[in-house]
Amino acid sequence: MRLQVIIPLIILLIFSYLIFIFPFEVISSWLGRSTSLQETILSTAFVYLVCLYYFRSKSSNKIIKLFVYEGIGIGTLSLFIVFFILLISFILNINEAQKIFIFFITFIPLIIYGFFNAKNVSVKQLKFSHSKIKKKIKFIFLSDIHIG
């Protein structure tokens, strides 16, 4: 296989683990349940194959679309919060119960904020005038659009 094909597949595999699996493995370990290497490999492979199928086929299956896009959102937020808690735990002595509490006290409000913020799209109309512009021109500038 060519490198142009292999590199995106490797990136998707790493992405699948870091976004979908790793944060929840860490949370699981904080709850006292460690995951085996076999569980990690199987769950990462499952997520990888679902994401690969979705991105390659552009499937319109609502369940797969929900799994991929909502999973990316929840997983990314979880990854950043878990990473932040792990960094803090190197500096301060925090037990597992406190880590779980910090995670949920941060995660739930951020998810609620993100949900409501996504529903509130802002539209601004700007008018420019200049002596060198003779024709009336209209254009649209779309910024930070996540189509899904």
Identify the meaning behind each predicted range:
Residues 1-121:
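Non-catalytic terminal accessory segments
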Residues 118-124, 129-148:
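Membrane-embedded segments
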